[in-house]
């Protein structure tokens, strides 16, 4: 999920703090009233982050889990949605400069972001898992990785999780390559976010790998708004309604084959 804290994010943090010192808060006048008056909720999203926000190869239409969540939230607010495609490294700067009203792009909740932005209740809950070949019953816990080989992107936090568990880590470029090595029996497992595994299984229909165990790590993905924005309460209400009426579950099932809007 989207957890990186880049130089661009540092500049954004400074801008937010300076705005707060100016006395008016970064939310300013009622953001909700402005959205209602305009009849549009402007949403910052990448458009290059499958299966959350990406362009369908056939139609080139912007689609994805987060794209549909954004549309559903806007509908609950009684407005249309307008997507503002923005690279991840500048997406928070775009929010601060009011290019859009909210970010819906798998923003992971953490203490730094809680201090800088208005964050909604979670609409996605993900967890670390260990994927193995479907016919391998030797891994049932994180401790079972000791002495085994795992395929990991060396810059990811999952590589550290595997190493700390005593695994021998082989570097790969991403999850797809990790699965290839796993199926070729060149490694015993790969540690990753459950959403990556579920997306792979749903999009490929490949039943040769399975989720064998959980790492115990979870993360929550939220909608980000400007600090002090009254949109947070309205979005929270919309998300609660979407959870209650089954919309979030339906969208989750479409993209992942299971409900990722709630903790399993």
Where on the chain are the PLM-derived regions?
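C-terminal motif of bacterial Sec signal peptides marking the signal peptidase cleavage site
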Residues: 15-20
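Periplasmic-binding protein-like
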Residues: 125-129, 198-240, 258-264
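Short loop->beta-strand "edge-of-pocket" segments that line small-molecule binding or catalytic clefts
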Residues: 40-45, 142-154
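Alpha-to-beta junction loops
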Residues: 78-80, 97-105, 148-149, 184-196, ...
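Extracytoplasmic small-molecule ligand-binding "clamshell" domains
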Residues: 28-104
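Acidic, polar ligand-binding/catalytic clefts
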Residues: 71, 80-144
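Extended ligand-binding regions for polar small-molecule ligands
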Residues: 22, 67-68, 75-76, 156, ...
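Short helix-initiation/N-cap motifs at beta->coil->alpha
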Residues: 67, 83-93, 137, 154-156, ...
């Amino acid at each position: 999920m989207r957890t990186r804290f880049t130089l661009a994010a540092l500049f954004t943090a400074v801008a937010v703090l300076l705005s707060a010192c100016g006395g008016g808060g970064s939310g300013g006048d009622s953001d909700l009233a402005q959205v209602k008056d305009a009849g549009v909720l402007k949403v910052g999203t990448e458009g290059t982050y499958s299966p959350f926000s990406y362009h369908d190869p056939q139609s080139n239409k912007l689609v994805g889990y987060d794209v549909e969540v954004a549309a559903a939230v806007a509908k609950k607010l009684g407005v249309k949605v307008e997507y503002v495609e923005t690279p991840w490294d500048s997406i928070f700067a775009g929010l601060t400069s009011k290019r859009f009203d909210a970010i819906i792009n798998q923003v992971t909740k953490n203490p730094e972001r809680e201090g800088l932005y208005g964050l909604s209740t979670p609409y996605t809950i993900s967890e670390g898992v260990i994927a193995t070949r479907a016919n391998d019953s030797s891994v049932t816990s994180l401790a079972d990785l000791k002495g085994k080989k795992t395929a990991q992107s060396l810059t990811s936090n999952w590589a550290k999780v595997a190493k700390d568990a005593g695994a021998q880590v082989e570097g790969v470029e991403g999850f797809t390559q990790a699965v290839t090595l796993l199926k070729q029996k060149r490694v015993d497992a790969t540690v990753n976010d459950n959403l990556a595994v579920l997306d792979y299984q749903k999009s490929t229909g490949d039943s040769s790998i399975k989720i064998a165990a959980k790492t115990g790590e979870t993360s929550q993905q939220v909608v980000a708004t400007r600090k002090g924005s009254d949109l947070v309460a309205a979005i929270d209400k919309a998300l609660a309604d979407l959870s209650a009426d089954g919309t979030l579950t339906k969208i989750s099932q479409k993209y992942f084959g299971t409900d990722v809007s709630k903790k399993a």
